[in-house]
Amino acid sequence: MAFPWRRRNKPGTLRAAESDDARYLSEWVSTRRGIEGFVEPRTAVTDTTMLLVAVDGEWTRRRVPSVEWAHNFANKNGIPSYDAAVVGYPDRMREWNKRQKEL
């Protein structure tokens, strides 16, 4: 049985990182403290992304143009950056997610 609302033979396209994403990341960095950056490599379904985690575990993720761009962004903003595939994610992020679910 075919589902008429499903598209066939039309591959999806990834949305590129935009200046809005860069602006959002800059604003986020300026309004939080103790931030670390985690650069996530491109996958089959997502472009390269940057995950920012604040000292309290609050986090945000946005697409970025490249791995190099993400590390340069972190350096310019004085925050450490790591390759997420190598170091993983901080426990405080998981703890923050858990606290948010309990609210």
Question: What name fits each language-model region?
Answer:
Residues 1-103:
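Intrinsic disorder
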